[in-house]
Amino acid sequence: MNPRRKKRLGLILALVLGASATVGLMLYALNQNMDLFYTPTELVNGKPDGTKPEVGQRLRIGGMVVVGSVKRDSQSLEVRFQVEDIGPKVTVIYDGILPDLFREGQGIVAQGVLVDATTVKAHEVLAKHDEEYMPPEVAEAMKKTH
């Protein structure tokens, strides 16, 4: 084989190998940052396609906070509450300050790790507001103009 061809072949193989490694690392990083969304019913019973999350899996869960289920630890910021949709209830454990819009009977989305079949240890809780929500500043301005 001609030395020039040998050099070209080595360069092409190195480029293909480098591109493959780059794509592989990108797919691995995307997989690590992917959080699948579940409702409480899907978390307990599985999704319609039969997939069910495993213990230790990162996920997001969304539903309504069960009225009377919020329990606060007096010694720390830990809060436990239950979330439901139309089926079973799932317990969410969160250590931190809850959003201002967090209320019983209100919709939330919690992002965290599945601890057991019906418990999620959340590191982020987002409170949903209803479609009629209006920031206080806007409501005040509308009162003045109308």
UniProtKB/Swiss-Prot annotation:
Which stretches are Cytoplasmic in the membrane topology?
1-8
The answer on whether this UniProt entry bears the keyword Heme reads: yes
Q: Which BP terms from GO are recorded?
A: cytochrome complex assembly
On the tree of life, the source organism's domain of life is: Bacteria
Q: Where in the cell is it found?
A: Cell inner membrane
Q: How does it sit in the membrane?
A: Single-pass type II membrane protein
Ranges per topology, Periplasmic = 30-146
Q: Which Pfam families match?
A: CcmE
**KW Protease (keyword) present:** no
Give me the segments passing through the membrane: 9-29
Under the heading InterPro entries, the entry gives:
CcmE (IPR004329), CcmE-like_sf (IPR036127), NA-bd_OB-fold (IPR012340)
**MF terms (GO), sorted A to Z:** heme binding; metal ion binding
- Which Gene Ontology terms of cellular component type are present? plasma membrane
Keyword list (alphabetical) reads: Cell inner membrane, Cell membrane, Cytochrome c-type biogenesis, Heme, Iron, Membrane, Metal-binding, Signal-anchor, Transmembrane, Transmembrane helix
Q: Where does heme bind?
A: H129, Y133
Which family is it part of? Belongs to the CcmE/CycJ family.
Check the record and name the NCBIfam families matching this protein.
PRK13165.1, PRK13254.1-1, PRK13254.1-3
Its biological purpose is as follows:
Heme chaperone required for the biogenesis of c-type cytochromes. Transiently binds heme delivered by CcmC and transfers the heme to apo-cytochromes in a process facilitated by CcmF and CcmH.
Can you name this protein? Cytochrome c-type biogenesis protein CcmE
Source taxonomy: Bacteria, Pseudomonadati, Pseudomonadota, Gammaproteobacteria, Vibrionales
Gene name?
ccmE
